[in-house]
Amino acid sequence: MSGALDVLQMKEEDVLKFLAAGTHLGGTNLDFQMEQYIYKRKSDGIYIINLKRTWEKLLLAARAIVAIENPADVSVISSRNTGQRAVLKFAAATGATPIAGRFTPGTFTNQIQAAFREPRLLVVTDPRADHQPLTEASYVNLPTIALCNTDSPLRYVDIAIPCNNKGAHSVGLMWWMLAREVLRMRGTISREHPWEVMPDLYFYRDPEEIEKEEQAAAEKAVTKEEFQGEWTAPAPEFTATQPEVADWSEGVQVPSVPIQQFPTEDWSAQPATEDWSAAPTAQATEWVGTTTEWS
């Protein structure tokens, strides 16, 4: 699918991202049309998706999106919470039209409806959850692209990208990869340099988890303030007035203290000392004498 071009081959960092997000992990059920995308089956019954096929279908989907002259004619849809943020980010990056949340029936078929639109390409996150837009796309002859798991039905799906469309990280990473490939094929960003947008921006975050993190951060800040207030002593207040010096060259006047004078002695006038070499010899003889008396 990549045409044997090294530029379009899957890089090692892309494989690591897929493995870290769990994109290769499918479900325990398998649709007969998804058998061609399966690599192996684990002992616990979970099917492993072939990431090489995932990358090839990702490039094919990016080529189909780039082929649309007006980016606004591409509709990206996600009715599940895990893909709504990714859909909005993808639309902001590529210029597509997002539909995050509930899809109003008749959007593609009912011309009287205020939300009626006629896109040229449809991209959905889950064929099972987004069955209504897929069904309406079949009525108006609209080509469709879908992120498909091992148990996803491929009815009315023209380009199926095999991946894990249940996990929040996997769905966000797939939309990030698709947006990056679209921008690369359009020439907006270079393949030689990494894209400055991180995949984390496409990940879904539960509002309850965000509130818990904010509360934990606030409690931590309050505890830190209380801890500092208990153990830090107040700074002493200096009320004594400092002497005002108008001219710093003069400085503060220091009273002079007289230095006490001591008499000096002339050492040369003293008599010469006796011979110190004779005294130890005499003492030594006396000690010898005493020793002989004891013996």
From Swiss-Prot:
Molecular-function GO term, any one: virus receptor activity
Positions of post-translational N6-acetyllysine modification: 52, 89
Annotated spans, Interaction with PPP1R16B: 54-113
Post-translational modification: Acylated. Acylation may be a prerequisite for conversion of the monomeric 37 kDa laminin receptor precursor (37LRP) to the mature dimeric 67 kDa laminin receptor (67LR), and may provide a mechanism for membrane association. Cleaved by stromelysin-3 (ST3) at the cell surface. Cleavage by stromelysin-3 may be a mechanism to alter cell-extracellular matrix interactions.
SUPFAM superfamilies: Ribosomal protein S2
One GO term of the biological process aspect: ribosomal small subunit assembly
Sequence segments annotated as region (Laminin-binding): 161-180, 205-229, 242-295
Signal sequence range: none
[DE]-W-[ST] repeats: 230-232, 247-249, 266-268, 275-277, 293-295
Polar residues composition bias: residue spans: 280-295
Entry function: Required for the assembly and/or stability of the 40S ribosomal subunit. Required for the processing of the 20S rRNA-precursor to mature 18S rRNA in a late step of the maturation of 40S ribosomal subunits. Also functions as a cell surface receptor for laminin. Plays a role in cell adhesion to the basement membrane and in the consequent activation of signaling transduction pathways. May play a role in cell fate determination and tissue morphogenesis. Also acts as a receptor for several other ligands, including the pathogenic prion protein, viruses, and bacteria.
HAMAP family named in the record: Ribosomal_S2_euk (MF_03015), Ribosomal_S2_laminin_receptor (MF_03016)
PANTHER family hit by this protein: 40S RIBOSOMAL PROTEIN SA (PTHR11489)
The protein, known as: Small ribosomal subunit protein uS2
Species per Swiss-Prot/TrEMBL record: Oryctolagus cuniculus (Rabbit)
Record gene name: RPSA
